[in-house]
Amino acid sequence: MLYRSALRASCGFTPRLASTRSRLASSLVLLEHKAGRLNDASLSAVTAAKATGNDTHGILVGSMAEVEGVLKEAKKIKDLSKIYLATSDAYSHSLAEALAPLLASIVPTKDVSHVFAAHTAVGKNVFPRLAGMLDSSLVADIIALDPSRGTFTRPIYAGNAVLTVKSSPKDSVKIVTVRSTAFDKAAIADGSADVEDVEILAIESPTQFISEELTVSSRPDLASAARVVSGGRALKSKESFDKILDPLADSLGAAVGASRAAVDAGYADNSLQVGQTGKVVAPELYVAVGISGAIQHLAGMKESKMIVAINKDPDAPIFQVADVGLVADLFESVPQLVQEIGSIKA
């Protein structure tokens, strides 16, 4: 409690949560965006919010230049009835020190019972601070919820167990981050959400945005790709990693991923890591090449719709979750597979 009080004081914010309100009527979703496009993970958060049975509202935050193009897309989200719009240069780049106080000032005045965000870098940065400011618990990385019981389900122990939790009755607002692979994306179709501007909160943030360096790739984004080809330590070197995986990924139109062992060995960049400490993916097709299947890796890909494993060890744990397994030398089988795919395409 002392920490939360200090956090609120440092931001000049005092919550105004009504103690006599009998029913909190809406769920609010933080709509992330980048380069003029909505983040697909936020669409999954909208689906989770809709499951509460409340009216579902979204909030777009950023500079006018950032949100101008996104707003048109956001208004079409099928399950949103209203979008709150907060435009200011102070909200550029989604810094937690600016966003959390803004959200905390909006929640008490808009009859909000739940606040949702995707369990992304932004959600993981903003929502713990928001929970502290609202004196509520944070329920992180949920994969299911039961509104009738007021419970949430989240994975623990690298996905080997699931935990059902219920936030405290003292929490007037539920603060929730959502594992995007566990919920379908809300459709961007025939929605017609109303737009309401919200008051800009003047806060002197101790944090300033300096710069951002992004890895540019012609391939699909790993986190949202429909197909993923991942390589493990069995590829033996960075040269082999690229030589074997790139043609297969290109032939399938897939993103490239890697196990932690491959990343630690220097075969692939950290941004390509799939697993508990990397990205969690659930593509239509996941091809694991030379990956043994450590628990930490399985936690990041076992929800994939179709898992294909190629490994010369028949006892590799990856085969326990694979839909299709090939026990073979990857240095021989993968080039043959690429050749066969090319023949089919021709």
UniProtKB/Swiss-Prot annotation:
Its main location: mitochondrion. One of its GO terms (biological process) is fatty acid beta-oxidation using acyl-CoA dehydrogenase. GO terms for molecular function: electron transfer activity; flavin adenine dinucleotide binding. The keyword Flavoprotein applies. Its cofactor is FAD. Binds 1 FAD per dimer. The electron transfer flavoprotein serves as a specific electron acceptor for several dehydrogenases, including five acyl-CoA dehydrogenases, glutaryl-CoA and sarcosine dehydrogenase. It transfers the electrons to the main mitochondrial respiratory chain via ETF-ubiquinone oxidoreductase (ETF dehydrogenase). Belongs to the ETF alpha-subunit/FixB family. This is Probable electron transfer flavoprotein subunit alpha, mitochondrial. It comes from Cryptococcus neoformans var. grubii (Filobasidiella neoformans var. grubii). The gene is ETF1.
